[in-house]
């Protein structure tokens, strides 16, 4: 953002009207590729495309030609003798659109970034990086969900039509050429709907090509879906809620246009009394969201069908009611962010002593509990070829070409990261099985590499292998509690939420 301020001397009140000319500035592509502002990002592609003779710092002509070629209809030329030539011709057209989309992704974020900075000026929360952490959600759930009764488990509807997405962006960006260019880019990538559905194969293609643009569009679409919660929250609660404000800071877009507020105030003013619930809490991660309340099942059913009608009328999306499940927190485990969370009744015995008599009172306290889901973890380990579907450890043949220390470090890093992520769970017995699978898989991989037996490697590297699979908190607790039994019992009860986890990596690719 600091780099943009040095180059973008645009009036904030009119900056959304002048986005298209920024597409011809070379530093935009330098920012998109993170190559710095002094390097020439288009230097090598210019030579490859036959633009020799032009100044490599003057990119306007290059960008114009890229846009022209992207607009032109091209047909594939098939060569019978050279199948690789076909891929080259097809890749050349994708290269033009990819170059433009990478620069366009930086430009389209400018109005939202500047609006974000202006809306959060003078607030201390902008200096906090802990809200970026995934684990920052769980302390909020522990504080709030233990007092709630019901929860709506929501899957965000998909897919949205491309033209409707552009119409929604038109409310924020009044630059017509930029919107026309975005329309061309979206139709160049026919797999846009696959991004919404989170299909792994198609999503991996986008993550390698234009992750920034499509994640921006997806976040904008999700924000539009969530805008109704912000509006109803402001209408039902006159005092600004700190927890609600903290939720808003964890998203990328914070304000809704005034026209939206006016329309909903006029249309739904008579029905707002149905949804006045001061104990409503909302949490989202990726395509799944949670709406919890202290209200009755009747109120939750009203919310369910209200959301279905809202998405259908505002986005022209048919969201099936079965994508929203109503569950009671006391007898249902919530699958969210890889944890199984629920609200359990914990009974504590209190002894009251008087002058004459003593009384023993059983007090039931609601407690938010999180456990480690062992079945999904074993499924992930089996997918990554660390074990079979039954959880039996197997060797990792793909890693046998690495050195012994590198193999041990890879297995140990995965084990430590899993322990680090599930450090806030109240019951960690499942992690011991995961550690056993990874440790024995590591030993099988080493024995396969050296054509030896697993027993010999466990005897020779037993202590080193054990130290590598210890987490940092285990090492600290082992120093405080020398006895292994007391340390294990203390570690099983210890709950630590780390605020340095900002994303979840795929276990199969985390090496």
From Swiss-Prot:
The UniProt record lists the keyword Flavoprotein: no
Keywords, comma-separated and alphabetical: Chloroplast, mRNA processing, Plastid, RNA-binding, tRNA processing
Compartment list: Plastid, Chloroplast
MF GO annotations: RNA binding
Gene Ontology cellular component terms for the protein in this record: chloroplast
The keyword Plastid is assigned to this record: yes
Listed GO biological process terms: mRNA processing; RNA splicing; tRNA processing
Main localization (coarse): plastid
Free-text function comment from the UniProt entry: Usually encoded in the trnK tRNA gene intron. Probably assists in splicing its own and other chloroplast group II introns.
Similarity comment: Belongs to the intron maturase 2 family. MatK subfamily.
UniProt-recorded name of the protein: Maturase K
Organism: Nandina domestica (Heavenly bamboo)
GN (gene name): matK
